[in-house]
Each structure stands twice: as C-alpha cells, then as structure tokens.
Amino acid sequence: MARLQEFYKEKVVGDLTAKFAYKSVMEVPRILKITLNMGLSEAVADKKIIEHAVGDLTKIAGQKPVVTKARKAIAGFKIREGYPIGCMVTLRGAHMYEFLDRFITVALPRVRDFRGVSGKAFDGRGNYNIGVKEQIIFPEIEYDKIDALRGMNISITTTAKTDDEAKALLAAFKFPFRN
C-alpha cells in the first residue's frame, strides 16, 4: 500500500471527521483520481512532438497516456477533425497515491521560485487544478534527453462537496498552499 494511502486511512480520516463532524467514515472526502493533461498545439506541424510528449507523460505517470484528438475542425488553428492535439492519463488507486507523494515531496520543491501553490484554484465542487510550466520538475525526466519544455495541467478530483473540505483534505496531505 502506498505511503499516502496508509497516512490517509490512519490519520487524515480521523482529523477530518473531527474537524467537519461527519457522522460516517464514508462521508470523509477522498481523492478519486488525478488526471494529467498535456495540450500540444504545436503537434499540428510535427507528429513526432506527440511521441515525445507521450514518452514524457509515461515516465512521469508510470502508465501509458491516451492521445487526445480534435473533436471538430478549426480553420484558424489549422486543425482538422481527428488530428492528435494532446495526451492525457488518469491515475487511480495506488498509482494515484504514489504520484501525489512524488508530486508533493519531490516535484513541487524543484519548481523555480516556488512559494507554494494557490489556494484559490478550486472549481467550486471540491476539485483542484494546478498548471505546471515545465515537465523537468519531475525527477523521471532527464534534462539532456528532452526536445522541448512542455507544461501540463494536473487535475485532482475529490469526493468533497465544498472547496473548504477539499482544501482541508489536500492540506492534510501536506499540500504546500500559499494562502
């Protein structure tokens, strides 16, 4: 079992139950999934970019991402329907907790001028989104072997009903909030 998963069951559930006065253990919010999404607008010109991005995301997440395709044609962006324009991977269970552990303890401190993540990036339904500008903050990516710096969106989906509950859940996992 992953370190954060054990920590959740042993400590976080009890703390959140006391803080929010839940009647049942099943009411305590938990993380459902973590989605990593990489949008690649420059992939229209060169198909190799998708392959490199898939390789990077595979190393970061530990499982193979799905290539996302354009749903409809947009002439202004020179995109036709069905063109590969990004890749995404959804993590659940043990993989999700392992990734979250690496993200909080190793990757986030490697961000340049890091002062904490914003506490206002919740969507109103208890889910949290964070943008990463460079994939090299992850230790699995070797700086010498990348072709370009790419960012990604990391979306953490929880069962929390409010943003306050979700923030308390992530703060219990030692998420470095700025405010």
From Swiss-Prot:
Keyword Magnesium in annotation: no
Gene Ontology BP terms: translation
GO cellular component term, pick one: ribosome
InterPro entries: Ribosomal_uL5, Ribosomal_uL5_bac-type, Ribosomal_uL5_C, Ribosomal_uL5_CS, Ribosomal_uL5_dom_sf, Ribosomal_uL5_N
Cleavable signal peptide: none
An example molecular function term from Gene Ontology annotations: rRNA binding
Quaternary data: Part of the 50S ribosomal subunit; part of the 5S rRNA/L5/L18/L25 subcomplex. Contacts the 5S rRNA and the P site tRNA. Forms a bridge to the 30S subunit in the 70S ribosome.
Family affiliation: Belongs to the universal ribosomal protein uL5 family.
Functional summary from the UniProt entry: This is one of the proteins that bind and probably mediate the attachment of the 5S RNA into the large ribosomal subunit, where it forms part of the central protuberance. In the 70S ribosome it contacts protein S13 of the 30S subunit (bridge B1b), connecting the 2 subunits; this bridge is implicated in subunit movement. Contacts the P site tRNA; the 5S rRNA and some of its associated proteins might help stabilize positioning of ribosome-bound tRNAs.
Name recorded for this polypeptide: Large ribosomal subunit protein uL5
